[in-house]
Amino acid sequence: MLLIGVAGTTLSAQEVDWLQDDAVAGVVLFKRNFASRAQIVELSAALREAAPRPLLLAVDQEGGRVQRFHEGYSALPPLQGIGALYVRDPEAALELAFEHAWLMASEVRASGVDLSFAPVVDLGRGNRAIGDRAFSDDPHVVAAFAKAYVQGMHAAGMPVTLKHFPGHGSVLEDTHVDLAVDVRALETLESEDLVPFAAGIAAGADAVMMAHVVYPNVAPEPAGFSAHWIEVILRGRMGFRGVVFSDDIGMAAVRGVGGVVGCVHAHLDAGCDVVLVCHPELVNDALSAVAGRRSNTAALIGLIGRGVLGWDGLLADVRYGSIQSHLFERFGTST
């Protein structure tokens, strides 16, 4: 029901107490939780040991400027860099996307973390928050990359989360700090922004993360608060059967919607399976909000613990060094 954030590199007594609550489905990790590769392995183990049930551990490890784990991990290029190669050599670009996905997912899984919220399949059309996180401004190019990225993550044993549904890339505003409104008609969205999501779903994506964007010509509320977007369009028209995550409820775009309690209820009532409460100072209010609600954490079981390879196993895998070298040759990235 809730995916919460914790404050530092070790667990406090209060955080251990939070993990006892059945409403806590897992923990999302950030740069503030990272000190070293070994420390992340230890923190992952400590989180699982502290929880009385299977716990989902997640991170944003997209590459480029959104990469929470650094030292000891491959410095992954942003997706835009891979997307730029598509015009010259589509086949090579898609192979690089597969390798990028496999490398990212393998390193995260080796650290005891279940999933990275990836890939971004928003269109790259000037949004302040998306920027070089997007493959391209062309829906069909992004769709091709979405398929390749799903395949690469799955090859590494990691579930896939497409984000940010139904598309964050065509508005200017950054929902971390401002309300974003997209006035286009549904027909336009279906022929543009929804195309990569449809491709990713068809390729077997396991989860979708919602956008904190309002599309007033489709529904009056932000997409994550909208049963029309989640139940009618995503699950109904598009046939998605996986897990639906909210984006972080600490963002300014949704902060004014009834406070933490109102925001949590709005997401769950609309059909989100899991609400992200990334700021520890909001966790107590979020837990109060869900007290008495029936827990639906069973929806996440398929995302948790698909077998942890461990770093020794990954470093011994010949694919690891080969893919690292290939990406380094193309983009000048390394550990």
UniProtKB/Swiss-Prot annotation:
Keywords: Cell cycle, Cell division, Cell shape, Cell wall biogenesis/degradation, Cytoplasm, Glycosidase, Hydrolase, Peptidoglycan synthesis. Substrate binds at D60, R68, R133, K163, H164. The active site is at H176, D247. GO terms for biological process: carbohydrate metabolic process; cell division; cell wall organization; peptidoglycan biosynthetic process; peptidoglycan turnover; regulation of cell shape. Pathway: Cell wall biogenesis; peptidoglycan recycling. It comes from the Bacteria. The record marks D174 as: Important for catalytic activity. GO terms for molecular function: beta-N-acetylhexosaminidase activity. It holds the Pfam family Glyco_hydro_3. Its EC number is 3.2.1.52. InterPro entries: Beta_hexosaminidase_bac (IPR022956), Glyco_hydro_3_AS (IPR019800), Glyco_hydro_3_N (IPR001764), Glyco_hydro_3_N_sf (IPR036962), Glycoside_hydrolase_SF (IPR017853), NagZ_Beta-hexosaminidase (IPR050226). It catalyses: Hydrolysis of terminal non-reducing N-acetyl-D-hexosamine residues in N-acetyl-beta-D-hexosaminides. GO terms for cellular component: cytoplasm. It is found in: Cytoplasm. HAMAP family: NagZ. Plays a role in peptidoglycan recycling by cleaving the terminal beta-1,4-linked N-acetylglucosamine (GlcNAc) from peptide-linked peptidoglycan fragments, giving rise to free GlcNAc, anhydro-N-acetylmuramic acid and anhydro-N-acetylmuramic acid-linked peptides. Belongs to the glycosyl hydrolase 3 family. NagZ subfamily. This is Beta-hexosaminidase.
